[in-house]
Amino acid sequence: MLTIKVITEQRDEVIRRLAVKHFDATEIIDRIIALDKTRRVSQTALDANLTEVNRLSKQIGGLMKEGKRAEADEAKAEVSRLKETNRTLEADKTQAEKDMHELLVLIPNLPHASVPEGTGADDNRCEETGGTIPELPADALPHWELARKYDIELGVKITGAGFPVYKGKGARLQRALVNFFLDCARDAGYVEIEPPYVVNAESGYGTGQLPDKEGQMYHANLDDLYLIPTAEVPVTNIYRDVILNEADLPIRNTAYSACFRREAGSYGKDVRGLNRLHQFDKVEIVRIDRPEHSYTSLEEMVTYVRSLVEALELPWRILRLCGGDLSFTSALTFDFEVFSAVQKRWLEVSSVSNFESYQANRLKCRYRDADKKVQLCHTLNGSALALPRIVAALLENNQTPEGIIIPKVLVPYTGFERIS
């Protein structure tokens, strides 16, 4: 959530930068500024009236002692009038704050200056590529057919489309990837968290999934709880309403979780097999840092995620997302994609983002600096990595007549070198 200070002091700049995200902010920004003025005017009047009430209250006792009952009664009447006025002013201020908050949560984060102009995925800028795209025979199979051939995935029998059931070596490959990613994160200095898979609305609001992505989240109505779309939500919310010490920063956490997304409106080739699921496994990395260090942290996270896709020997590329493809809460995002040699397309396996102070302002996640001043933290997170499309690319790219070759780094975790 943007701060009132930024909105009121940098109105034109805020409107200009939000236009990069194709968000027309003029009307809502001006409404917020007007409400903030109402709030401040009400507060000023309240403060003045309270000062006067205190002054008159002190006078009343003296007037009574001096026998000036009529003057004391006038002062009492004025105190009563001022208190009644203050009740109205307090109600006006409270309503202005409520209306202002309801508008603030509708405004996306400001994009970083380096975010390219663009309307969608086609305008994202490729920053770097690596790995070798394998040359496969014409009869090479897509991963959903390989899963059937090798009997490693049972499909939609239990829950329906988008909820895969892994079997045998398929299940062991999933577990191997999770353990490999968690071990790598631990070795890189991340502290492992085991989070819940359901959160309350306040947690979803804190990281920005609510209200923006409410329609994409599974909601347990009876308990008013949400299935998590990513471990980012519970892990980042650990630091809600917390004031950290500067010496505690940066905080590095990692977590494995199942993730749940409704993916309403998805259809066609993008949803075949493991391309787009309602439930999937992912390892997440989360960092909390000082504002002046957060972009260094972002670079380190990008480097770390690159090391994972390189270790899996997959062809990869890094995209800097354009304004039109940037998420509601992100200031800058780098997407990692791996190439599917059979589908002939790039598959997203990670997004690494800096949210600057946007989430922290919602969460009230702060730190006390060297001067003992309380400041908003910057929050960052990234997928490290999301499993389904990694599995899809591994199955397709590593298929041979003898079976599917397992990357060397995974063999100690799987206990086998090929699926055959």
Give each language-model segment a name.
Residues 26, 130-420:
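TRNA-recognition modules of translation machinery and tRNA-sensing kinases, especially anticodon-binding
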